[in-house]
Amino acid sequence: MVALKGVPALLSPELLYALARMGHGDEIVLADLNFPASSICQCGPMEIRADGLGIPQLLEAVLKLLPLDTYVESPAAVMELVPSDKERGLQTPVWTEYESILRRAGCVRALAKIERFEFYERAKKAFAVVATGETALYGNLILRKGVLALNPLL
């Protein structure tokens, strides 16, 4: 937790540091409690702990600071359901919540859905993985950092 003006208090110093160091196109994974964060981070990404936080509340806080990439089809991606979960009709209401939060932050593009093992491979290339306490199944979310137009052309 940090005590700074304009910075959401639930963002840890480690997460703020990662967000600041990320460049255009870098990705960050907001991982649910079932995600193998420590194993994935052995491949390179920085592991950041946010135990006890849900991804929706963390997403709202992160999006106050992180610009999303507007040069890609979708700057946000979730893990697609495996076939057996699709067959049994498993619902993913957390995705609707993510889409609502993303829209409020100005992102009108749909969530990309990535096959499970492709998601793991993409996560291995992320800048950081934030291990949360999110309990929703298929709650994992990848965000791609965009650019800030600090000196817009006249």
From Swiss-Prot:
GO molecular function: fucose binding; L-fucose mutarotase activity; racemase and epimerase activity, acting on carbohydrates and derivatives
Protein family per UniProt: Belongs to the RbsD / FucU family.
InterPro entries xref list: RbsD-like_sf (IPR023750), RbsD/FucU_mutarotase (IPR050443), RbsD_FucU (IPR007721)
Organism: Homo sapiens
Record bears the keyword Nucleus: no
Enzyme class: isomerase
Reactions catalysed according to its record: alpha-L-fucose = beta-L-fucose
Pathway it works in: Carbohydrate metabolism; L-fucose metabolism
Disulfide linkage: none
Encoding gene per record: FUOM
Record: active site: 24, 69, 120
Subunit structure: Mainly homodimer, but also exists as homotetramer, homooctamer, and homodecamer. The homodimeric form seems catalytically inactive.
Functional summary from the UniProt entry: Involved in the interconversion between alpha- and beta-L-fucoses. L-Fucose (6-deoxy-L-galactose) exists as alpha-L-fucose (29.5%) and beta-L-fucose (70.5%), the beta-form is metabolized through the salvage pathway. GDP-L-fucose formed either by the de novo or salvage pathways is transported into the endoplasmic reticulum, where it serves as a substrate for N- and O-glycosylations by fucosyltransferases. Fucosylated structures expressed on cell surfaces or secreted in biological fluids are believed to play a critical role in cell-cell adhesion and recognition processes.
Designated name of the protein: Fucose mutarotase
EC number: 5.1.3.29
Positions contributing to substrate binding: 32, 79, 120, 138, 140
Coiled-coil region list: none
Transmembrane segments: none
Family matches, as Pfam families: RbsD_FucU (PF05025)
